[in-house]
Amino acid sequence: MIVVLTQCFPPRIGGIENLVFNLSNNLSKKERVVVLADQHDTKSETFFDKNINPNLVIKRYGGLKFFRKRNKFKELEKIISLNKIKVIISDSWKSLEYPIYKINKTIPTMCLVHGNEIIVKNNNHKKRIEDVFLMTDKIICNSNFTKKY
C-alpha cells in the first residue's frame, strides 16, 4: 500500500492538484493507494470520489487546520498499524511536517517540492522546511530552481 498526504486534490483545479491526482491514479494501477486529503467542497468531492478507480481510496478531512492535521495523522496511524506501507508521499513539506516526527522511520517518505512553497519568510520558517527535508528519505523537485534550494 502507498499513502499520499495532500492538501491539494481534485476536484479543486490547479497544477499541484493535477500532479497529485495523476501520480496517485497511476500508482493505483499497480498498488492500492490511500489519499488523505483536505476537504473543501463536500458535494463536488463526494461526486468526484465516487467515480474513481476502486484501487484508489480517498479520505478527506475538513475543519480547522489544527484539527485537520491531527485527524489525518490519526488515520495515518491506523492505516500503518493495519497495513504494510511501501511509501508515504506528500504533496509538500507542509503535509509531512506533523507526521514526519511521529511515523515509523522504517517507512520510506517522499516529499514533492514546488518552487513557491519554499520561498522563505523568516528564519523560523526556513528551519521548519529544513527540518522536514532532513527527515524525508527522498525529495522530488519540480524544477531546477527548486532543486537549488
Where do the protein language model's features map onto the residues?
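N-terminal strand-loop element at the rim of the active site
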Residues: Q7-I13, N22, N26-R68
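Short, well-ordered alpha-helix to beta-strand connector turns
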Residues: K30-E31, I85, T136
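A conserved, positively charged/aromatic
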Residues: M110-D137
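Extreme N-terminal starter segment of soluble prokaryotic enzymes
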Residues: M1-V3
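Phosphate- and divalent-cation-binding pockets in alpha/beta enzyme and binding domains
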Residues: E97-P99, K148-Y149
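A short, active-site helix/loop in glycosyltransferases that binds the activated sugar's phosphate group
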Residues: T136-Y149
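Short, well-structured alpha-helical segments in soluble
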Residues: K74-K84
